[in-house]
Amino acid sequence: MPKRIRMTTSNATNSLIEDLRWRGLLNQTTDENGIAELLNSGPQTIYIGFDPTATSLHVGGMMQLMMLRRFQRAGHNPIALVGGATGMIGDPSGKSEERNLLSADQLQKNVDGVAAQMRHFLDFEGDNAAKLLNNFDWMKDYSYLEFLRDVGKNFPVGAMMGKESVRSRLESEAGLSYTEFSYMLLQAYDFVNLAQTHDCRIQAGGSDQWGNITAGIDLGRRMLGKQLFGITAPLLTTSDGRKMGKTESGAVWLDPERTSPYAFYQYWINVADEDVMRCLAYLTEIERAEYDELEDKTKNDPGQRTAQKRLAQWLTELVHGEAGVQSAQRATQILFGGELGDTTDSQLREIFADVPSCDVPKSALEGEGLWIVEALQTAKLCNSGGDARRALSEGGVYVNNTRVEDVQKRLTVDDLDGRSVLVLRRGKRKYALLKIQD
């Protein structure tokens, strides 16, 4: 991982702004020159909000965590705000329909899970330690009438209706509930509260948060007479505009219980060539020289997937540690024919989750065992006994990634090596999994 560097000089600010610019992370700013002047005046506080809609963040949330991380590395003070209050309502920005409202218990579980993951990205100790706050702490005792008097009176309905996040939902079939319509007021007040209590002058977020961020800036001017600033970064999307972080099996999470280090690593290994350089710029801290080198290698020899390997290694180490990287790389080697070693049942089932499989009773491996020719046909790796014999004689059959050439080979309990699965392979990449049932 890159060494942590503390910088507070004007050169550091210029470097930060320039770094954000070349990475393509400055999607919109309310006043770029004003932000640069503010950052040059000394360490500043910046915040980004995260609504706890699940017990884990998914990869899209890394864009914002990395934004806070970049500001912290430049000597500024990041606040990660968990929406214990706003999460009860749900942000309509970028959503086609209203979310189901979460119970208080589920919301707290989500808050706890998301908060723990932020520690992989931010340093919560030291001179410019990150702060983890929850907006439920200042909203829980704020009465509805007081909120309307203090905050609601500062929001012209016409201006709210003009926000893209509101207008698009009003024009949709799903419509927009009053609950969601009120979300903008709550997020705007978060900015005002943090400006009062932590002298926070900058809010950042994804491009879909522009309306909410500017609402907070307007409220700060009305309530505090203070100039606040906003920055948005692009959303993490593919070159054709689809949001990244989804696979056929669902979202790619940061929680290893929901998306294993191996699956997380593989997601980045499989990023398309036209997307990988953008991901490296958005999500890592690699320097410009290395970026340019990886870009050249991707153009000249895309088959090596050098940029994808670097992206997968960098992000997996950040989220899952060095052990997670080693585990993921070992699993990848197995997929390409490496020794199984001490790989467990569950790891093998995960590595080969997408290959054909069949159930075999354990009794078939007892006594004389299961004839390899029959096993290859059962697993549909060979069409007939003759096909299986040819594959064996040509040296193209593997059991647990060990070559088998003996046509009379019998698979027995000893071949399981304490596991409950057998990995069969024909050729380089044609796999099947035998799941042994008691």
UniProtKB/Swiss-Prot annotation:
S4 RNA-binding domain: residues covered: 370-436
Single Gene Ontology MF annotation: RNA binding
GO-annotated cellular components: cytosol
Location (main, coarse): cytoplasm
Keywords: Aminoacyl-tRNA synthetase, ATP-binding, Cytoplasm, Ligase, Nucleotide-binding, Protein biosynthesis, RNA-binding
Database matches in SUPFAM superfamilies: Alpha-L RNA-binding motif, Nucleotidylyl transferase
Binding site for ATP: K246
UniProt subcellular location: Cytoplasm
Residues that, per the record, bind L-tyrosine: Y47, Y183, Q187
InterPro entries: aa-tRNA-synth_Ic (IPR002305), Rossmann-like_a/b/a_fold (IPR014729), S4_RNA-bd_sf (IPR036986), SYY-like_C (IPR054608), Tyr-tRNA-ligase (IPR002307), Tyr-tRNA-ligase_bac-type (IPR024088), Tyr-tRNA-ligase_bac_1 (IPR024107)
Reaction(s) catalysed by this chain's protein: tRNA(Tyr) + L-tyrosine + ATP = L-tyrosyl-tRNA(Tyr) + AMP + diphosphate + H(+)
Motif ('HIGH' region): 52-61
Function of the protein: Catalyzes the attachment of tyrosine to tRNA(Tyr) in a two-step reaction: tyrosine is first activated by ATP to form Tyr-AMP and then transferred to the acceptor end of tRNA(Tyr).
Family (UniProt): Belongs to the class-I aminoacyl-tRNA synthetase family. TyrS type 1 subfamily.
Assembly: Homodimer.
Matching NCBIfam families: tyrS
Protein name: Tyrosine--tRNA ligase
UniProt source species: Rhodopirellula baltica (strain DSM 10527 / NCIMB 13988 / SH1)
